[in-house]
Amino acid sequence: MKPFSPEVSPDPCPATAAHLLRTYTLFLTLLELAQGCRGSMVSNRPFITVWNADTHWCLKDHGVDVDVSVFDVVANKEQNFQGPNMTIFYREELGTYPYYTPTGEPVFGGLPQNASLVTHLAHAFQDIKAAMPEPDFSGLAVIDWEAWRPRWAFNWDSKDIYQQRSMELVRAEHPDWPETLVEAEAQGQFQEAAEAWMAGTLQLGQVLRPRGLWGYYGFPDCYNYDFLSPNYTGQCSLSIHDQNDQLGWLWNQSYALYPSIYLPAALMGTGKSQMYVRYRVQEAFRLALVSRDPHVPIMPYVQIFYEKTDYLLPLEELEHSLGESAAQGAAGAVLWISSEKTSTKESCQAIKAYMDSTLGPFILNVTSAALLCSEALCSGRGRCVRHPSYPEALLTLSPASFSIEPTHDGRPLSLKGTLSLKDRAQMAMKFKCRCYRGWSGEWCKKQDM
């Protein structure tokens, strides 16, 4: 682990960072040409759920075995935050990410335009190789940088310090400039540097581990938090659409998009969760369709608790989060639990009971429905996507045709049943196909040349 230090190592040459990024981009392009379609853990699979939690501590510290392997959940060995299927980098674990502490102290320069990108990439090079020792890593590679956002306009409330300190830098250099010019220059400097840092880090990861699904947690965002509005629809505002459109470089560079659909506590009992989630996931698809790769996997981040509470989501809220994501044709979802939730025996027992009674059966239901729909409608070569005429339709199995039964000998839950003609007709009416890369046509039967 690197020592905590606010010091910044000056770049050896002002042009080095730009040259380094151009070199990485060239390497990445050559790799893509050589490999063609990147294979990954989500390739040609309708819907997967990834367990991104360190619940192994429940067994190690409290004797509570949260056995997620019995479900259709891809979990790392020992269920920790880094492994062959899933690696997440927090700010202390990848390079020398610049930010301000809650007391306003700069770390590694504080601002991206006041920090050394070359030093960061050199450290990140070693961090990536250490966290992902296998060159053919093909799992999810998530960067969790939340201190600042790459668009100036998105840095409000506690993030306003990045605007204020950016303007201070410009004032110090140009004390005679009017405030309008100071802010315009500060905005330009900040956004240019933010792009260099975020794009450069992605490019480095993609060069070192080209099969990994590299992307940033929480991007894109819809900022649709006005739950108390009596006319709340959940839709992203036009101004948010415009700002997200300016981040084309980020969507073009990402190998996966990881929007957050954590449910804030304010949504409890409001009946607005599905609207909230729907437009956050839709925004990811909107941006993916105009990016360099319209097939980029969408993998929303889901919590099983209401955010910052100890209240587990009821089944209907799982339908509004996991279920909504699957119905829109997401490649899967990442289930995350904070380490605080695994720190007590009581919390671990609650998680285990929830997994056994609610979450596990629901995951098996949704993933099985997605697979059966893919085979029935899309020739097994695409994902079922909800038809706009049926905005409430979910990919779940009919209880008249299927049953999910627990076993008593430690083996996984069992699914029994077959699709009836009525089930197939309902799927065909409410869903259509989004074909995997290389396939097209209404039923994904045509192989692209």
Curated annotation (Swiss-Prot):
Q: Which UniProt keywords apply?
A: Disulfide bond, EGF-like domain, Glycoprotein, Glycosidase, Hydrolase, Lysosome, Secreted, Signal
Question: Does the record carry Disulfide bond as a key word?
Answer: yes
Q: Name one Pfam family in it.
A: Glyco_hydro_56
**What is the E.C. number?**
3.2.1.35
A GO cellular component term found in this entry reads: cytoplasmic vesicle
Function of the protein: May have a role in promoting tumor progression. May block the TGFB1-enhanced cell growth. Overexpression of HYAL1 suppressed the growth rate of colon carcinoma cell tumors in an experimental model.
Can you state which reaction this protein catalyses? Random hydrolysis of (1->4)-linkages between N-acetyl-beta-D-glucosamine and D-glucuronate residues in hyaluronate
Q: Which GO terms describe its molecular function?
A: chondroitin hydrolase activity; hyalurononglucosaminidase activity
Look up the coiled coil feature and give its residue ranges.
none
Tell me, which GO biological process terms does this entry list?
Answer: carbohydrate metabolic process; cartilage development; cellular response to fibroblast growth factor stimulus; cellular response to interleukin-1; cellular response to pH; cellular response to platelet-derived growth factor stimulus; cellular response to tumor necrosis factor; cellular response to UV-B
Provide the primary localization.
Answer: secreted
User: Which PANTHER family does the UniProt record give?
Assistant: HYALURONIDASE (PTHR11769), HYALURONIDASE-1 (PTHR11769:SF23)
Q: Which InterPro entries match?
A: Aldolase_TIM (IPR013785), Glycoside_hydrolase_SF (IPR017853), Hyaluronidase (IPR018155)
- From the record, give the cysteines joined by S-S bonds: 58-348, 222-236, 373-384, 378-433, 435-444
Q: Where is the signal peptide?
A: 1-39
Instruction: Look at the named UniProt entry and state the broad enzyme category this protein falls under.
Output: hydrolase
Where does the record say carbohydrate is attached?
85, 114, 231, 252, 365
Q: Where located?
A: Secreted; Lysosome
- The residues annotated as the active site are 146
EGF-like domain ranges (all copies): 433-444
PROSITE patterns given in the database record: EGF_1, EGF_2
**Descriptive protein name:** Hyaluronidase-1
Write down the SUPFAM superfamilies for this protein, in alphabetical order.
(Trans)glycosidases
